[in-house]
Amino acid sequence: EDKFVGTFWGEIDVLPGLKFKSSYGFDLAFWGKDGYEFPYFLANQGKDVTQSSVWSEMNRGYKWQVENVLTYNKTFAGNHNLTVVLGQSAQRYTYRQLGGSDYDLLENDPSKANINSAIADRDDERVYGGTGGYNNASLASYFGRIDYNYAERYMIQATVRRDGSSRFGPSHKWAVFA
């Protein structure tokens, strides 16, 4: 398996008490599996493999996320503390898979066990000539939060979030969570 993960971000003070932060992250992964089986016989077990076989599978996944957040902090009249957060987030995940198998290897040599060296009849129903898959998902969000406290003793918080997802039902692509 090979995996590459990274995050980049930056933050600036826009005005006194107002900050803007933007970040981008990614996760890229490649993985797979290969296998082979040569003929063998287990005496009195009834578990014989009379033909060689080989299989291979490759997978790739990619995810990215971007987030932008404005944060406002203000203390007034000595004991009143207010924080307001507004933000936007988006992410996407994509996955691809490709696989296949074959039978009747030309040689029983592990170093030569690959699908190209198998000669099973193409009409053989066991031959898994190839399959693939593709999946993706997206999520977009807008969110806000207000925090207020008096003298760091009495606190109240309100949060709202609106998400849109490719995985939500066809007539309900967006929802509000509070």
Predicted regions and their residues:
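Surface-exposed extracellular loop regions of Gram-negative outer-membrane beta-barrel proteins
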Residues: 2-76, 137-178
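Glycine-rich, aromatic-flanked loop segments that form ligand/cofactor-binding clefts
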Residues: 90-94
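Flexible beta-alpha connector loops of hexameric P-loop NTPases
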Residues: 132-133
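Surface-exposed loop/turn segments flanking beta-strands in extracellular/periplasmic regions
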Residues: 1, 35-52, 96-129
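Histidine-centered active-site/metal-ligand motif
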Residues: 80
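Long, low-complexity, repeat-rich, intrinsically disordered, solvent-exposed domains used
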Residues: 83-87
